[in-house]
Amino acid sequence: MHSFQEFYNVYKSPAGNTGESYSDFTRTVASPQQTNDTIAPKKNSECLIVIPAYTNRISEFEQMNLKNNVERLGKCFDICIVCPKLLRADVYNSIASGVELQYLRLPSRNFIGKNSYSNMLLSADFYKHFTAWKYILILQLDVYIFG
C-alpha cells in the first residue's frame, strides 16, 4: 500500500499523455490558503475518511449509507465532508448523530457535474488539504461499509 504522500508526489507531476498538467485543473479547486475551513487531525489516526457531498437533499439510500458508515468509521477515523460552500451542515450532522464531522467547503463550480468533479479529484490542490494524514479514503455516498 502506498502512503498518501507518495500518491500526492506522483499526481502533482504532469498528466502524461493528455498534454495537460495538473496545474491546468487547479483553476477549479481552492488551495488550502484560499478556503476558510481548516481540517486537522483530531483522532490518533493516520487515515482520513473524505466524503464528497454536493446537495442538501440526499436520498434515503444515501442517508442510510452515511449513518452506517460514520457509525462504523467515526470511532477510529476523522471524517471530512467535502462540499460546496453553501451546503447546509445540519443535514449531514443530524444523520451522523454523535460523530464529529469536519467540513471542507470548496467553490460550488467543483460540484456541478462529472467533469468538474473529476477535475477536482485530479487536482493537486485538492489533496493539499489532506497532507496532515498519511492515508485518505474517498468514500462516496453510494458505499455501504460492512463488518
Task: List PLM regions with ranges.
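N-proximal low-complexity "stem/linker" segments adjacent to membrane-targeting elements
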Residues: 2-67
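Short beta-strand-to-loop acidic/aromatic patch adjacent to the donor-nucleotide binding site
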Residues: 133-144
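A structural signal for isolated positions on well-ordered beta-strands in alpha/beta enzyme cores
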Residues: 48-50, 78-81
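Catalytic core of nucleotide-activated saccharide and alditol-phosphate transferases
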Residues: 11-14, 102, 147
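Active-site-proximal specificity loops/subdomain of glycosyltransferases
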Residues: 82-134
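Short catalytic/ligand-binding loop motif for oxyanion handling, primarily in non-cytosolic enzymes
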Residues: 58-61, 87-91, 144-147
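Short, acidic, metal-binding catalytic loop of nucleotide-sugar glycosyltransferases
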Residues: 64-77
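Short coil/turn segments at beta-strand junctions that form active-site/ligand-binding loops
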Residues: 45, 77, 133-135
